[in-house]
A protein has these predicted regions:
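Glycine-rich, N-terminal phosphate-binding loop and its surrounding beta-alpha-beta segment
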Residues: 1-21
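Helix-rich catalytic cores of soluble enzyme domains
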Residues: 25-170
Length: 170
C-alpha cells in the first residue's frame, strides 16, 4: 500500500474485503440515481478510507464518466493515492495504463524503482472475457504488473451481458 500499516496478504487462506468495483451509477442521501462522476468517485474513495473493515478498493467505487476515458486512469489513480493510504488499483486496459498507475503509486510512496519493484504496492484484477479467454490488453497488463512484481488477481469470473451471454442457453 501507500503506507506499510495498510499492507495485507491477498490469496491463500486470506480473504480480502473491498469496496464495489465500477458501477456506472451512484445514488444516496436523498439524491436521485445519476451517472458516475469525479466528485462522487472522490467521496467514495474517502468513505472507503474511513471504513476499517475494507482492505482496499477493487476498482473505481463509481466510474467517473465525466472524465474522458483516455485520461480517466490518471485522475482516478491520483485521487486514490492522495485521498487514501490503502493499496490502489489499476485496470489492465492497456500497457500504458498499468505503467502510469504503477508510476503514480511509486511517486506517492516516495520510493525509488528498486524499492517499488521489491514491494508490492498496487494491484490489478484480470477477469476472463469469455470462458477462459484473455485478450491482448489483459495480457499486457499481466506482463507489465509482473515485470515489476506487483499483484495480479486472475479470475474466471464472467459477467452476464458483458463478458458472457445474458441468459444461459436452455
Amino acid at each position: 500500500g501507500i503506507t506499510p500499516q495498510r499492507d495485507f496478504i491477498m490469496g491463500g487462506k486470506w480473504i480480502t474485503y473491498t469496496a464495489v468495483a465500477s458501477p456506472p451509477f451512484v445514488t444516496g442521501l436523498g439524491r436521485d440515481r445519476r451517472d458516475g462522476n469525479r466528485e462522487d468517485f472522490r467521496n467514495l474513495i474517502k468513505l472507503t478510507q474511513m471504513l476499517n473493515c475494507l482492505h482496499t478498493t477493487a476498482g473505481y467505487p463509481v466510474e467517473p464518466t465525466d472524465i474522458h476515458a483516455s485520461v480517466r486512469h490518471l485522475y482516478a489513480t491520483h485521487d486514490a493515492v492522495t485521498l487514501s493510504d490503502k493499496p490502489p488499483f489499476v485496470y489492465s486496459l492497456g500497457r500504458q495504463r498499468n505503467i502510469d498507475g504503477m508510476e503514480i503509486t511509486r511517486i506517492a510512496r516516495g520510493v525509488n524503482q528498486e524499492t517499488f519493484n521489491s514491494e508490492p504496492s498496487i494491484f490489478s484484477v484480470i477477469n476472463a472475457s469469455t470462458p477462459l479467454r484473455y485478450d491482448t490488453v489483459m495480457l499486457h497488463g499481466i506482463q507489465e504488473m509482473s515485470s515489476r512484481n506487483q499483484v495480479i488477481c486472475i479470475t474466471p469470473f464472467t459477467l452476464a451481458g458483458a463478458m458472457a451471454p445474458v441468459t444461459v442457453a436452455g
